[in-house]
Amino acid sequence: VGAAVYCEDGRIFAGANVENASYGLTVCAERVAILRAVSEGVRRIQAMVVVTRDGGTPCGACRQVLAEFADEDVWVWCYGEDKQEGQEYRLSDLLPNAFSLRSRVLQEEEITLGGT
């Protein structure tokens, strides 16, 4: 699996799947690309491209990590190894009602304001 993210400042960061004998420690290409960008100071991701054997979409963990650094309407393009055309998705379609620290803070403010 390979992935790349396009960032708000125009930079592109690529990532590859990093396998581990202990499967739970494997890191997906999408998260590698996102974390490379974040480690270089990027805070907002504008788009993501993923290439898998069959054109599959990012796993739930990768979707959640992307949601922390992208708006819900960010495009995610998924391609298979041998296909010329990919599928395009909005993050909000892949992860509706995503949890984020921002959404949690807003919920807490609403609860506080609603109770006064």
Place the predicted regions along the sequence by residue.
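Compact, glycine-rich, soluble single-domain proteins
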Residues: N17-R31
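C-terminal binding/interaction regions
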Residues: E40-T116
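Short glycine-rich or small-residue beta-strand-to-loop segments that form or flank ligand, phosphate
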Residues: V5, G15, M48-V51
